[in-house]
Design a protein with these regions (language model features):
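DNA replication initiation on ssDNA origins
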Residues: 1-91
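A generic structural motif
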Residues: 128-135
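Short beta-strand
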Residues: 120-126, 164-169
Length: 190
């Protein structure tokens, strides 16, 4: 994965699955390298679960299998997985780009790898989307929605796409994925 960022800079939460609302089974405050390394290497059985999701024959089966994945709260530290549970922001925003062709995803990946504020991106669990972690200068919980919309607008203007609107919610979890070609820029700037 290369150079690690200052681990004290970006503290986030990981949860065992979508139902783990109080973060009982994983370290409460982890550095971003823990989920990023898992995404890149497929450890903790993640690669096998992602292969099963990508090879599922129906959307219902894919959705059911996704429920067993770890979820990451890139937005910050939460005592509970709801908006009132956020105690501090990481300054990170996760943009979720869904249902794109391989050609479109390749173009987006190539373009955003040159954007200095993109910290990381990786294929979504379904394989036809992209999760993009953007560094911002916002540490104010009340301003998260506005910050998200500004980042979202950058993607809309650049690619003519509308990222998943659910991610505007402060407590929206991100399913972990597997992508050995994950992009990581430890020197991303707001």
């Amino acid at each position: 994965m290369g150079v690690l960022v200052n681990s004290n800079l970006f503290k986030i939460n990981m949860f065992k699955n979508i139902w783990d609302i109080e973060n009982q089974d994983l370290e409460k405050n982890c550095c971003i390298e823990i989920p990023l390394l898992a995404i890149q290497t497929g450890t903790y059985g993640i690669a096998e679960k992602i292969y099963a999701i990508r090879n599922a024959v129906s959307k219902e089966e894919r959705d059911r299998l996704k429920l067993s994945l770890f979820v990451v709260m890139w937005q910050g530290i939460f005592t509970r997985k709801n908006n009132n549970g956020c105690v501090s922001l990481s300054s990170l925003v996760c943009i979720d780009i869904d249902h794109q062709t391989k050609q479109d995803l390749d173009y987006i990946r190539q373009t955003i790898s040159g954007w200095p504020f993109v910290l990381a991106f990786f294929r979504s669990p379904s394989g036809d989307g992209l999760k993009v972690i953007v560094r911002t200068d916002n540490y104010i919980i009340a301003d998260y929605g506005n910050c998200y919309r500004q980042v979202e607008q950058l993607f809309t203007d650049a690619f003519g796409i509308k990222p998943d609107k659910l991610c505007e919610d402060l407590s929206h979890p991100c399913f972990i994925s597997y992508d050995p070609d994950m992009y990581y820029n430890p020197y991303a700037v707001p």
